[in-house]
Amino acid sequence: MEFKKFLSFAIFIIIIISSNNSVYSIEPDIFVQSTVNRASQALDDKFSKKEKIDKLKSIAKETVDIQGISFYTLGSYRKNLSDEQKKEYTKLFEQYFLKSFSSRLAEYSNPHIEVQSKKKLNENYTMVSSVLVETEMRPEVKIDWRIYTKNIE
């Protein structure tokens, strides 16, 4: 049940595809499938738990807009904070996010996530729908990814 709640949180994850990065030219659904494939490889049984956690943290740092999520969680309180407070909050949030994200997923074995569809919401946002395929040990879980495509020129 905890893992299902965690995956529900994934709906709010904003992933940035930046032109400074080779993934800019990749379609959002292909980017998501590539990212989940990398995560699945990181969860291979040949790696120790620490190695899995390190690999998952690296993937998250590359693909998740952790600062954007931290500001989103602050909501309207953000405007009342100084730049130094925002910087400290973002640093602590990143530590918490990476620890929570990686340690929960590191316990998961053989995840198989399939991208099912994508829907362009506007010029910058695309919603990619996927599913964690059910097994004898777990039910099917739907995961929606909100992808923000950022063109830095």
Sequence positions of predicted segments:
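Sterically constrained small-residue positions within well-ordered secondary structures
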Residues: 16, 57, 106, 119-121, ...
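Early exported N-terminus immediately downstream of N-terminal targeting peptides
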Residues: 27-105
